[in-house]
Amino acid sequence: MTEYKLVVVGAKGVGKSALTIQLIQNHFVDEYDPTIEDSYRKQVVIDGETCLLDILDTAGQEEYSAMRDQYMRTGEGFLCVFAINNTKSFEDIHQYREQIKRVKDSDDVPMVLVGNKCDLAARTVESRQAQDLARSYGIPYIKTSAKTRQGVEDAFYTLVREIRQHKLRKLNPPDESGPGCMSCKCVLS
């Protein structure tokens, strides 16, 4: 059974724990209890493959930022979560993404942008802004509500699919010897 190491990152109070607990326990956590670091495991079937999700729910508070490098090193894929009613959390996504890329020493890291709390009427981040950001990063964007469960499975399962595609790209890099100048040896005289 394949195991996937998923890491949930984002600013404090965006609903990282609520999303994770909704996926694992089918339960919405109403009260805010700041997380330092929690780990969850769940066996699921995604596209016919039974797999084990190893999910690390991380601290959003700045005082725990020193711990980030360590869990970013071990993570295979990242859910980058912001709250649609919190512009600052949306702006913070760039910093999380840059830190992930720096720690992984790669521009090609599986990620999904997640706009949480989409059940709320009051929104300060428009869907278009999030879609544009995701497009500029070359990653999927999923709207979620930990409260109603909307998009919760989709977000985590999409990340697993991104990890699978990433692994395939690493196993089968693009063919460098295709048509064009690289494939023939030319002698100029």
Curated annotation (Swiss-Prot):
Q: Which residues form the lipid moiety-binding region (S-farnesyl cysteine)? A: 186
Q: Keywords, A to Z?
A: GTP-binding, Host cell membrane, Host membrane, Hydrolase, Lipoprotein, Membrane, Methylation, Nucleotide-binding, Oncogene, Palmitate, Prenylation
Where is the motif Effector region annotated in this sequence?
32-40
An example Gene Ontology biological process = signal transduction
Q: Mark the residues carrying the PTM Cysteine methyl ester.
A: 186
Kindly list the residues that the UniProt entry marks as S-palmitoyl cysteine lipid attachment points: 181, 184
Residue numbers covered by the propeptide annotation in the UniProt entry = 187-189
Q: Which NCBIfam families match?
A: small_GTP
**Name by which UniProt lists this protein:** GTPase HRas
Q: Which organism is it from?
A: Moloney murine sarcoma virus
Q: What is the lineage of its organism?
A: Viruses, Riboviria, Pararnavirae, Artverviricota, Revtraviricetes
